[in-house]
Regions:
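Bacterial Sec-dependent N-terminal signal peptides
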Residues: 1-31
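Phosphate/dinucleotide-binding and metal-coordinating scaffold of catalytic cores
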Residues: 31-354
Length: 354
């Protein structure tokens, strides 16, 4: 006997299979999703660990300590999971300079699944060295550079209650921010990190122009390509070109943090601290890059003006400092003095002229 083919039943089976496929795909995507850096909304959390030992640990390779991270979900549920916490960095770990060190928080992926920290492994947590406001200003600089290129580290501002398990007391509650792991940046941009020896001449030219001018704009000279100081280099899988990604902006003149000021130096120097460390581009190349930053000026101003965690006085100072950059690039004499007279050549790197 010949069985009749039912279009309705066949369509139903296809629909069920497709729905199952979508559900499975969504589950896989959810497991991969980086939810932490998808929002700028500030949320509060409590970080518990042996901060007495962490603050005292000045060893070259600091020890990780057991900890707990606790926060409330949007539904009001208490989310709690285990972490490892250790001090990181060099300069800011000095207790004579900073009252509290920057941290590295190590997550267990199986514990943070389906939380805001889904898919996180190790994250840098930037803490207040001295003034809490400095942290928020550095956060704003990261957000400014996010406007320059997607090849940049994302950040998330949080309010953290630090609890010392050694003394069973609160240390303090302060604003801090997490920095995206470089592996996630690489995945977003279809790139991979490179740790070979490079000079600025090996990098994508447009990328390095934007990096060097941005560092000048914020007044940060605490970076080098060759030694990879506060710079990560990635190679694009698509273009095979090398791209520099800057980080650690706390020495920027835009912030003007007290611990970054050298002694016995004039206030005039301290008020600018701008040193161009880019290459000797053509005037046309400079012109195109300056025009790129002119278009970003209202965006930068808005990021500063709308950050109400920074005092009005400091925001005005930040805006004046930003305006100083735009005045310089509009003045031919200052442009020559600040850029053309100090830019780096191939000879400085013992490279043959092309």
């Amino acid at each position: 006997m010949t069985r009749k083919f039912s279009v309705t039943k066949a369509f139903h089976k296809i629909s069920v299979c497709f729905s199952a496929y979508l559900l499975l795909s969504n589950m896989v995507q959810a497991q991969k999703a980086d939810t932490l850096f998808l929002s700028d909304e500030i949320f509060s959390l409590e970080l518990r660990s042996n901060f007495s030992a962490i603050r005292a640990d000045t060893a070259k390779d600091p020890k990780p300590y057991n900890g707990k991270l606790i926060y409330l979900s949007p539904e009001g549920d208490v989310i709690k999971f285990s972490v490892k916490v250790r001090a990181r960095g060099d300069f800011r770990r000095n207790p004579e300079i900073c009252s509290f060190p920057p941290l590295l928080v190590n997550f267990k992926k199986n514990e943070v699944r389906n939380t805001i920290f889904n898919n996180q492994d190790k994250l840098k947590l930037v803490t207040a060295c001295q003034k809490e406001e400095d942290v928020v200003e550095e956060y704003v600089i990261y957000k400014m550079y996010n406007q320059v290129t997607d090849m940049s580290l994302k950040v998330r501002l949080v309010r953290v209650l630090y609890f010392d398990t050694a003394t069973d007391k609160e240390v303090f509650e302060r604003y801090s921010f997490f920095i995206e792991h470089e592996d996630q940046l690489a995945e977003r941009n279809n790139a991979f990190e490179r740790d070979s020896l490079f000079t600025p001449f090996d990098l994508n030219r447009e990328n390095f122009m934007k990096v060097s001018v941005f560092e000048y704009l914020i007044g940060n000279k605490d970076w080098f390509i060759s030694s990879r100081r506060n710079i990560i280099v990635f190679r694009s899988e698509d273009t095979k070109a090398l791209y520099a990604v800057p980080h650690d902006f706390d020495f920027a003149g835009l912030i003007n943090a007290s611990y970054t000021k050298p002694r016995n130096v004039s206030e005039k120097y301290l008020s600018t601290r701008r040193v161009f460390k880019g290459l000797c581009y053509t005037e046309d190349e400079f012109s195109r890059t300056f025009e790129f930053y002119r278009k970003l000026k209202p965006v930068f101003e808005s990021l500063i003006e709308n950050q109400e965690l920074i005092s009005k006085t400091t925001r005005r100072e930040n805006l004046r400092y930003l305006e100083g950059f735009y005045q310089i690039i509009e003045d031919k004499d200052l442009f020559k003095k600040e850029f053309l007279d100090v830019c780096e050549t191939r000879r400085m790197y013992n490279l043959p002229e092309q």
